[in-house]
């Protein structure tokens, strides 16, 4: 008999044009007085100010994500406004102080908009607080705002979704070989998000219509729910993410660094090849939306890519993937050659 299971998923999801205007309705159902709004450094600050003005009846303070003092308390509600970094910092603060969290994504570049988990890079920096898990009580995705985000960020969101087929296959492999707990329902949710973008890559790639962004946001939210059900990032993060993390760790802070979703898409192509999955289909979908489909296009050096492929398995030793105990340099190079990434 299986043990008792529990999971947390967002109780409210509002998306569409003008969704940001619904924030007061969501907050009115909570017993809060002081609100911390965490934003990015650029255009997202203006959206954070909009949220603050909508909550004029509350005491709201706006901080950029790199200004947040995790030891400072006194807030009743945390609202993250922006892309990956402000939303991740909002999750960390919510987790540390056990306060409810609302996320307001201003772009859709990865599945962190609905996930209870944070990026690998940030998780390493804040691991003294434990494993950060903070499921938002509400997601407010205003598609009119997201539609105005840089196209590169939106394409990166597609790239993140292209990796889900590999993540699920890695999970299944770990289940069979290592006895890891597996949720078919969570896996199917993740795969559904992958299938949505592959089937519609040619139509949504330019992101000129609200419905294009809506399809992307729905798929990303579906992945966040899948992770909540699984109780881990397993259904959405496998060897393709380990490859991306290995490169991100080396290039952190570098000028012109590749975006997370772009690296995930490249990783998905290589890992699909190793799994025997139809990697050409993934590469075709990536090309259809304008994602880099070669290392050169992504600005990644061959030596760095080989290093990432041969060391990625060490980043999370507890997460078994197709990489096993690691690829040899020659096997890594052959995979890159066979998939025409070089």
Curated annotation (Swiss-Prot):
One of its GO terms (biological process) is glycerophospholipid metabolic process. NAD(+) binds at residues 84-88, 106-109, 115. The keyword Transferase does not apply. Keywords: Cytoplasm, Lipid biosynthesis, Lipid metabolism, Metal-binding, NAD, NADP, Oxidoreductase, Phospholipid biosynthesis, Phospholipid metabolism, Zinc. The keyword Cell membrane does not apply. Binds 1 zinc ion per subunit. It is found in: Cytoplasm. Pathway: Membrane lipid metabolism; glycerophospholipid metabolism. It catalyses: sn-glycerol 1-phosphate + NAD(+) = dihydroxyacetone phosphate + NADH + H(+); sn-glycerol 1-phosphate + NADP(+) = dihydroxyacetone phosphate + NADPH + H(+). Substrate binds at residues 111, 160, 245. CDD domains: Gro1PDH. Its EC number is 1.1.1.261. InterPro entries: G1P_dehydrogenase_arc, G1PDH, Glycerol_DH. GO terms for cellular component: cytoplasm. One of its GO terms (molecular function) is glycerol-1-phosphate dehydrogenase (NAD+) activity. Pfam families: Fe-ADH_2. Its cofactor is Zn(2+). Zn(2+) binds at residues 160, 241, 260. Signal peptide: none annotated. Catalyzes the NAD(P)H-dependent reduction of dihydroxyacetonephosphate (DHAP or glycerone phosphate) to glycerol 1-phosphate (G1P). The G1P thus generated is used as the glycerophosphate backbone of phospholipids in the cellular membranes of Archaea. Homodimer. This is Glycerol-1-phosphate dehydrogenase [NAD(P)+]. The gene is egsA.
């Amino acid at each position: 008999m299986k043990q008792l299971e529990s999971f947390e998923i967002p109780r409210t999801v509002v998306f569409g044009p003008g969704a940001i205007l619904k924030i007061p309705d969501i907050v009115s159902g909570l017993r809060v007085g002081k609100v911390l709004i965490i934003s990015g450094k650029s255009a997202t600050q203006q959206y954070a100010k909009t949220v603050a003005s909508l909550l004029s009846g509350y005491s709201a303070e706006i901080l950029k994500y790199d200004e947040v003092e995790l030891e400072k308390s006194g807030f009743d509600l945390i609202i993250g406004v922006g892309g990956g970094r402000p939303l991740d910092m909002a999750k960390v603060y919510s987790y540390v102080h056990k306060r409810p969290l609302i996320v307001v994504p201003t772009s859709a570049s990865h599945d962190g908009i609905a996930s209870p988990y944070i990026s690998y890079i940030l998780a390493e920096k804040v691991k003294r607080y434990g494993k950060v898990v903070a499921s938002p009580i509400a997601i407010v995705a205003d598609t009119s705002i997201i539609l105005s985000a840089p196209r590169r960020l939106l394409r990166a969101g597609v790239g993140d979704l292209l990796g889900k087929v590999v993540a699920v296959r890695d999970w299944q492999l770990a289940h069979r070989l290592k006895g890891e707990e597996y949720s078919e329902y969570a896996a199917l949710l993740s795969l559904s998000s992958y299938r949505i973008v592959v089937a519609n890559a040619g139509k949504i790639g330019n992101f000129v219509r609200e419905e294009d962004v809506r399809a992307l946001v729905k798929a990303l939210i579906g992945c966040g729910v899948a992770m909540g059900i699984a109780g881990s990032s397993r259904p959405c993060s496998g060897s393709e993410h380990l490859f991306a993390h290995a490169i991100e760790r080396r290039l952190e802070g570098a000028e012109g660094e590749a975006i997370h979703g772009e690296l995930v898409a490249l990783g998905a192509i290589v890992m699909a090849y190793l799994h025997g999955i139809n990697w050409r289909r993934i590469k075709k979908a990536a090309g259809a939306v304008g994602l880099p489909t070669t290392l050169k296009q992504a600005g990644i050096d061959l030596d760095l890519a080989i290093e990432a492929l041969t060391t990625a398995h060490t980043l999370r030793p507890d997460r078994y993937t197709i990489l096993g105990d690691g690829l040899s340099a020659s096997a890594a190079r052959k995979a890159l050659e066979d998939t025409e990434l070089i």
